């Protein structure tokens, strides 16, 4: 089997979409088999091979093309590569019209969309609707995302929308992180959150964690919050920490590598991301595989991932409820084995089986 993967980015950024599309690349390279090949076309990444690429390609990658945000080059390359492949997997709705255009030059090419979250929770333009109608299947990361697509495009056949949950990158599974984790641990409850600190992503709820921290510290005076990630919203969040009087209890680590991230997960007492617009919430799995309880918002697809045995939910923006949930997770620890078992249900082999069942179906 010959596959073409279209991605907005793979290695340029560390957002959730880039991380999951690396795993799509890994799965496609393994599904292609010894006689198959995979081509990868990326809109935003720079030309050349990222040193991490071999970790995801299993020797079956035929060509990797980065277009450095050149949309015309991306379109022309999609047509060229589409001519020699059997199936095209499109990693973002914005790229889907390109996938349909590629099909004009190869009538046997079937294309599929990976639908994540807020990228598809909205009304669609004419070109997007046209492209959606031509998709062989739409792979939704959650049932919530599936319902949102049908809400905004009700003329689609519901049977063509299938749920393929996100998966955990095996590279982020626990490794030998004990010394690094021990160096990070403090004397009080340690709350961890991870993500891009972008001014366009204020819905993530980092500010609500900062606002809840003074309430948490009334019960646990040594509680701290570590915010992993960088972006243009960091100055605002730093000012908020100062206004709340918790500057000394909030640490901004900036962007870190995978080894440091594993150490952060291992060292924390709980993970929190009270976001109101998560199509899945990949970071929850990353925390769960380390046996850490998770706090999320009662919104989007998060309730599909966080269940009572592994964490807690709070209404988005409800500061007292967020603080109470954090306190409950500290005072009533969840079973790490049960948490890891929940993460294991989303492990890469299960993801690969789900994907194969869709892509290889007659």
For the regions a protein language model found, what residue spans apply to each?
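Short His-centered aromatic/hydrophobic patch
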Residues: 90-96
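Short alpha-helical donor nucleotide-sugar binding micro-motif in glycosyltransferases
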Residues: 255-256, 263-268
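Aromatic "clamp/platform" in nucleotide-sugar-dependent glycosyltransferases that forms part
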Residues: 276
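Short hydrophobic beta-strand element within catalytic cores of glycosyltransferases
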Residues: 293-296
């Amino acid at each position: 089997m010959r596959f073409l993967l279209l991605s907005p980015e793979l290695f340029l950024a560390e957002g959730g979409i880039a991380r999951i599309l690396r795993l799509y690349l890994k799965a496609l390279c393994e599904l292609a088999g010894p006689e198959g090949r995979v081509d990868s076309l990326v809109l935003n990444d720079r030309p050349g091979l990222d040193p991490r690429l071999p970790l995801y390609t299993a020797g079956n990658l035929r060509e990797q093309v980065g277009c450095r945000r050149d949309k015309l080059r991306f379109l022309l390359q999609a047509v060229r590569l589409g001519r020699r492949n059997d199936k095209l997997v499109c990693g973002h709705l914005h790229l889907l019209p390109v996938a349909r255009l590629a099909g004009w030059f190869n009538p046997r090419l079937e294309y599929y969309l990976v639908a994540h979250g807020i990228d598809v929770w909205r009304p669609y333009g004419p070109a997007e609707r046209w492209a959606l109608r031509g998709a062989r299947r739409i792979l939704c990361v959650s049932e919530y995302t599936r319902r949102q697509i049908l809400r905004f495009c009700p003329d689609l056949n519901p049977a063509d929308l299938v749920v393929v949950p996100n998966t955990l990158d095996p590279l982020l599974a626990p490794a030998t992180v004990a010394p690094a984790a021990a160096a990070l641990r403090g004397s009080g409850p340690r709350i961890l959150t991870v993500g891009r600190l972008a001014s366009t992503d204020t819905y993530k709820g980092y500010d609500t964690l900062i606002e809840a921290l003074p309430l948490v510290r009334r019960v646990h005076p040594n509680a701290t919050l570590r915010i992993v990630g960088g972006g243009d919203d960091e100055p605002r969040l730093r000012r908020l920490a100062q206004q709340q009087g918790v500057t000394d209890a909030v640490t901004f680590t900036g962007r870190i590598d995978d080894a440091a991230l594993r150490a952060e997960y291992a060292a924390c007492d709980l993970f929190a991301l009270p976001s109101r617009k998560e199509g899945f919430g990949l970071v929850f799995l990353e925390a769960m595989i380390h046996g850490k309880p998770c706090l999320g918002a009662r919104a989007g697809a998060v309730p599909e991932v966080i269940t009572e045995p592994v964490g807690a939910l709070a209404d988005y923006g409800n500061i007292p409820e967020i603080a109470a949930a954090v306190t409950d997770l500290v005072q009533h620890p969840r079973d790490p084995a049960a948490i890891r078992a929940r993460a294991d249900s989303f492990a890469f082999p299960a993801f690969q089986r789900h994907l194969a069942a869709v892509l290889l179906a007659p």
